[in-house]
UniProtKB/Swiss-Prot annotation:
Superkingdom of origin: Eukaryota
HAMAP family linked: IF_1
Protein name: Translation initiation factor IF-1, chloroplastic
Keywords, in A-Z order: Chloroplast, Initiation factor, Plastid, Protein biosynthesis, RNA-binding, rRNA-binding
SUPFAM superfamilies: Nucleic acid-binding proteins
Plastid is among the record's keywords: yes
Keyword DNA-binding: no
Organism the protein comes from: Chloranthus spicatus (Chulantree)
Length: 77
């Protein structure tokens, strides 16, 4: 049976080496996020200030996988 994951939205606050990011969730938790393979393959750029959806395991709530970059309303991308 596949593990149930929690999906949160958050803001990238800091870019770390090797595709890792510091993410502040909407509930004010600060966690470590890494880029999913699909985003890596699609060459989607994630920068500090971007809003993202992040998938967090029930067993380790300090790390998560970034699964989607939300579009900003003020940019043209």
């Amino acid at each position: 049976m596949k593990e149930q994951k929690l999906i949160h939205e958050g803001l990238i606050t800091e870019s770390l080496p090797n595709g890792m990011f510091r993410v502040r969730l909407d509930n004010e938790d600060l966690i470590l996020g890494y880029v999913s393979g699909r985003i890596r393959r699609s060459f989607i750029r994630i920068l500090p200030g971007d809003r993202v959806k992040i998938e967090v395991s029930r067993y380790d709530s300090t790390r998560g996988r970034i699964i989607y970059r939300l579009r900003n309303k003020d940019s043209n991308d």
